[in-house]
Amino acid sequence: MRRIILASASPRRKELLKQLIGDNFVVYPSSYEEPPQPGLDPEELLLKHSVEKARDVAKHFDSGLVISADTSVLCEGEVLGKPGSPENAEKMLEKLSGKKFRVITGLTVLDLDSGKETSEFESTNVWLAELSKEQILAYVRTGEPLDKAGAFAAQGKGAVLVEKVEGDFFNAVGLPLFRLGKILERLGVSVFDEGFS
């Protein structure tokens, strides 16, 4: 069985990967700093970040598969990352309230044994309910939105704010499992192998 390395500190990505392959992976967060890249469209930027994260972690291992991802929310042409503060979370939720937007992820799998690097992009449409100021403030007070792209967690308390999801739901959580499964399959790794349980 191949060693799998998740290049992320995200508890959501860890839980999602665990759904696919059990505990058969190691977590090694990337130390890559995401510099501003003016002129790149959001998809290119997320792919670039996921590639750089995978390459950063790959330097610490001599074999296995490194999986990395970078996720943002795109609403009306604006990229919304993690808010980082309650004030920014409020602003983001006000912007997303009652709207359709896209959750976009750049995904990279780097095969250290063959040197093959696969990077792909996933997009999921999400419709957020019309939120009152009180709902926004109450949700922000939970602390949940502060470290989430777009200031909401589709898998947490934020689930009650989501009216509809079109596409890979798991992408809206932070790791597009369908696309990841297809990439792993092309690299000769099946999540249905007995070793992954």
From Swiss-Prot:
Keywords, comma-separated and alphabetical: Cytoplasm, Hydrolase, Nucleotide metabolism
Signal peptide (residue range): none
Major subcellular location class: cytoplasm
Name of the top EC class for this enzyme: hydrolase
One GO biological process term: nucleotide metabolic process
Record EC number: 3.6.1.9
Keyword Cytoplasm: yes
GO MF, one example: UTP diphosphatase activity
Annotated compartments: Cytoplasm
Xref: InterPro entries: ITPase-like_fam, Maf-like
Reaction catalyzed: dTTP + H2O = dTMP + diphosphate + H(+); UTP + H2O = UMP + diphosphate + H(+)
Annotated catalytic residues: D70 (proton acceptor)
Site location (Important for substrate specificity): R12, T71, Q155
Family: Belongs to the Maf family. YhdE subfamily.
Name of the molecule in the record: dTTP/UTP pyrophosphatase
Species of the source: Methanosarcina acetivorans (strain ATCC 35395 / DSM 2834 / JCM 12185 / C2A)
